A protein has these predicted regions:
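The feature captures the beta-strand-to-loop junction immediately N-terminal to the Walker
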Residues: 37-39, 333-335
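Conserved ABC ATPase signature
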Residues: 138-142, 146, 429-433
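Helix-to-loop junction immediately C-terminal to a conserved catalytic motif
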Residues: 52, 348
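Conserved ABC transporter NBD signature motif
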Residues: 60-72, 356-364, 373
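Catalytic Walker B motif of ABC-type/P-loop ATPase nucleotide-binding domains
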Residues: 163-166, 454-457
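Conserved ABC ATPase "signature" C-loop
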Residues: 217-218, 507-508
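Conserved ABC ATPase "signature" region
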Residues: 117-134, 407-425
Length: 578
């Protein structure tokens, strides 16, 4: 008998026109590490909520079929009966943190189940996820990555046989994402925990998982080994799922869809060995002529701190100097906790610097209220639903223009609705839209304010790859709607394709201000900041080729192999990547 058996399950939420799961069957064995792939709305999260009993015991609806988990028939059991067998880390993991201190939160589940050794169980869980020594810290003092690990510690404190993690890397920087997956790998290999991840990032699936399930339109299309699944390039693309970039590149060069295609970076080094460039001693970077530019924001020697619960100061920004100019398309990058979001809030006037000055069009933000700058700066939140205050998208877009008594605002609203392709959903409540639709609508609301400066916080977080590509096209158009645009993001592909300036932050300081050539060709800088370049860029660097910023770039350089222009002079690296 399999550890998990799902037999012909159909589930439909109340009021929904179509079922979220339609005749779904799936078996998962003990010790598997399996990824569930599919576009937004394909049924991935609904499928996983069957396994811990949240469906149908919390989220009600019409359900048929049978689900057996660790020999427990879930439709006939309680959620508490399944809690010892199934741990779950949700996509919005911060909502799982329910106690003030780290050790209290990690030991909360065993305490609720009456275990006398609940504190020891909590400490053991913290040790497994690498948070030992953080026991007495308050959860709001943790970075985003540490909070995710704490949610994971709480989920494994009951030592479940099955662990489900929804979108493990959606809100994490690359370094913390790898740390989280390394913990999952350890649990799988050392404790035989069955790991189920809902994942859009196929590079992580290739590196860590054993099997993969493809879902589309509420159905399971197939379950296959990772290698067999990720090399089905055409089928995945048809479902708006994108295989690893190196797999796409190899397929484009050979037009052969088989299991010999590389799916990891180490495999790609061997596969593309014949394309490796000769060694060179120098890295050649494009020289640009500096021009005098019009300043929009001038940040001068700024410090910023938050007060902790013990009334001590926690330094967030330290000695930051930065000028934002007209025409800048800036990517603000760095690990969780580097200070990116705080820096953007200072530009809005919502936060005031502890030391130094923030000048917006030569106006000191310390001397004016945030309302003074509302006409000049738009801040689009990481969670787009926070932008919706009315009962329709059109009303939300109109709101600011009406409040400012803008003449002929209806013409501007119509232009924005057309620009962001919102015509069909303009009368719907933004809070009820899909993730991609919400993001488009939030961008439209921001543009409607007609600002000089647009600030976006993680605009592609929590989106599947197909939707991310779609949203990226709309972000490209923002350069025509404002004098400057700044994006705080972990999405290095967006950075590589969109930004004309990249600012790298670490521990509250700016450690580099350059462009994609100066950032992505500098391995020491990438390591220092904990940044992971897009896979296709990394393989081109390791092969000594000119940096490829997209799969198309790599294929073009490879097809022109042998021509001097195909190489940047990057030194050859023979070492394998681990």
């Amino acid at each position: 008998m399999s550890l998990i058996e799902i037999e012909h399950v159909t589930f439909q939420y109340p009021g929904a026109a179509e079922p979220s799961l339609n005749d779904v069957s799936l078996n998962i064995e003990q010790g598997d590490f399996i990824a569930i792939m599919g576009g937004n709305g394909s049924g991935k999260t609904t499928l996983c909520k069957l396994l811990n009993g949240l469906i149908p015991h919390y989220y009600v609806g019409d359900i048929t079929g049978a689900i057996t988990v660790d020999e427990i028939k879930t439709l006939e059991s309680k959620v508490t009966d399944l809690s010892r067998s199934v741990g779950y880390v949700y996509q919005d993991f911060e909502n799982q943190l329910v106690r003030a201190k780290v050790i209290e939160d990690a030991s909360y589940s065993p305490l609720n189940f009456g275990y006398h050794d609940y504190l020891e169980r909590g400490k053991t869980a913290l040790e497994k996820v690498g948070l030992i020594g953080k026991d007495e810290e308050y959860i709001w003092e943790l970075s985003g990555g540490q909070k995710h690990l704490l949610a994971l510690a709480g989920a494994i404190s009951l030592e479940p046989k099955i662990l489900i993690v929804d979108e493990p890397v959606a809100q994490l920087d690359p370094q913390h994402a790898k740390e989280l997956y390394d913990v999952l790998k350890m649990l799988n290999e050392k404790e035989n925990t069955t790991i189920i991840v809902i994942e859009h990032h196929t590079e992580f699936i290739a590196e860590y998982c054993k099997n993969v399930v493809l879902m589309s339109k509420s159905k399971i299309i197939w379950k296959k080994s990772v290698r067999e699944g990720l090399t089905r390039v055409n089928e995945l693309r048809e479902k708006d799922i994108f295989p690893p970039q190196i797999t796409q590149a190899a397929y484009s060069l050979t037009e052969k869809e088989d299991s010999t295609l590389p799916i990891t970076l180490n495999e790609a080094l061997e596969y593309f060995e014949s394309y490796q460039a000769p060694e060179h001693n120098q890295i050649f970077l494009q020289q640009t002529v500096q021009k005098i530019k019009e300043k929009i924001v001038d940040i001068q020697n700024v410090d910023f701190s938050y007060k902790t619960i013990s009334r001590q100061k926690k330094k967030i920004l330290n000695g930051v100097n930065l000028t934002i100019n007209k025409g800048d398309r800036i990517a603000l990058v760095g690990n969780n906790g580097a200070g990116k979001s705080t820096l953007m809030r200072l530009m809005t006037g919502i936060e005031k610097p502890e030391k130094g000055e923030v000048l917006l069009k030569e106006m000191n933000t310390k001397e004016f209220s945030p309302e003074k700058f509302a006409d000049m700066v738009t801040y689009i939140y990481q969670n787009p639903e926070e932008m919706f205050i009315d009962d329709s998208i059109k009303a939300d877009i109109e709101y600011f223009l009406k409040a400012r008594n803008v003449k002929d605002y209806a013409i501007a609203v119509d232009h924005i609705i057309e620009l962001f392709q919102l015509r069909e959903i303009k009368d719907r409540d933004g809070r009820l839209l899909s993730g991609g639709q919400q993001r488009r609508a939030s961008l439209a609301i921001g543009v409607a304010m007609q600002p000089l400066l647009i600030l976006l916080d993680e605009p592609t977080a929590n989106l599947d790859i197909g939707t991310r590509k779609h949203i990226s096209k709309f972000i490209q158009s923002l350069k025509d709607e404002a004098e400057a645009v700044i994006i705080a993001t972990h999405d290095m592909q967006l950075v590589a394709e969109w930004a004309n300036r990249i600012i790298v932050m670490k521990d509250g300081q700016i450690i580099h201000d350059g462009n994609r050539e100066t950032v992505f060709s500098n391995k020491a800088l990438l390591d220092q900041a904990g940044l992971t370049p897009p896979q296709i860029m990394e393989i081109s660097r390791l092969l000594g080729m000119k940096l490829a910023y997209s799969v198309e770039d790599f294929v073009k350089y490879a097809e022109n192999f042998g021509e001097e222009s195909a190489y940047s002079g990057n030194y050859k690296e023979a070492a394998r990547v681990y």
